[in-house]
């Protein structure tokens, strides 16, 4: 079987080629990625910039890019803990060879980075970066329990070496990276014995990734990538259990060809994911872990007119794990300009949520060790909206959507048969609809403001993994109503002031078969950045200024008011 698997991998490598995704991190290392700009506006601000005006007499095709809004399904982890990049400064790599950054604050929060370019020619680029993020402070539980506090500890160290070569008509990228992450499971066990006795879990992850894509039009345009990950952990479900590890291989390919002239394309995308887990002898027969293989094909046609774009395609997903499955779902998008600055869009998509070990670690590192979450399937997801730009620098987006997912997972604190410090996945069928609006304003150039309001509606059925079913099934740990506000004010050419606010309510969890309503997230943050000179920048940021008490997951409290400050030195 393994010989066949490796033969399949080799065949996919030769078939898919390599894809340039410009030094992107893996899903796991995104937890550590630094935002190279100190720009506290909404993360999706790029997607809501004002649409270009069609000018005469030059005929220019309007910008009708598909509006695939990626709204979060759970409260952002970064609002609870100071994450790398929260107060990072702009690194003008074109002028400087490298940088050193260090921030520190209460709760022993530390955020550091070092980066250097070894080579930066027109055709070859080599650079290296090292990131550090850690915390080691006491936090209070929000439940009535003794002891009522615990030390939350984590330390992530990430290093990456990148190489890029620019050919005449294509670009090739390759990088290697290593992540060493250690942390404790600080969840509330309500006085029960801690399974890992507060020892540090450790994840080690090695990643090698290469990619290639054409930069000039070709008879057949190509874009491909290949990625290999090796990961291992230190502890299983107890101190004496065998630990978890394995290999993950990902390959992607996009081939398309112009037809009927213009920007019309016919193409096919392919994707392969293979996760091969090490055998764990200490698991019971009903806990055996299956390898995961998924092969996806997405044939599509892309059509464009003067003021519209349309993509018609389908997702064909073949999944092989403990049982073999075939799924088909739509992949259709349409957008059109209805006036000089306004547009409408509609998308109908679907697909498979892989939920590999690395996917789940990115969502929450506190998942029960040696646990694999079953893949989910979305037969269809529909979203649409209107983007209205009445004034230059002012934009309103109204949106809504509806989605059905089979085997959606909900992470809750393990409470049966007794409380433990881990999160476990419950699986159920989820219907999720939402409506909302975004406003982005930069009418007065020194001030940029982005506001998003969203209301979610959930319906849950066929939940698996419950020992005792509550009177009502909830979409556990998914917010009902959200408000996200970010503002940046450039007081001078050297001083920037920022303000951020995130609110989420109607959050639920479950413990001992009883629904538990979580406290609202009511997080206000403020910060400032000052450029002392071209080489030195200092910054200060405060999170959770209201010192609100709430759980990220039931039994996993967030830090109270926390302040970080530091500097960036560019050389």
Spans of model-derived segments:
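Residues on the lipid-exposed face of transmembrane beta-strands in outer-membrane beta-barrel proteins
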Residues: 114-118, 159-165, 208-214, 251-257, ...
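Transmembrane beta-strands of outer-membrane beta-barrel pores
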Residues: 104-106, 132-136, 167-169, 178-184, ...
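Residues that define the transmembrane beta-barrel architecture of outer-membrane proteins
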Residues: 94-96, 108-110, 153-157, 200-206, ...
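Outer-membrane beta-barrel translocator/receptor signature
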Residues: 81-84, 91-140, 153-159
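Outer-membrane beta-barrel domain signature, especially the mid-to-C-terminal portions
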Residues: 359-375, 405-429, 457-484, 502-531, ...
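Repeated loop/turn-to-beta-strand initiation elements of outer-membrane beta-barrel proteins
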Residues: 123-126, 169-173, 217-223, 259-268, ...
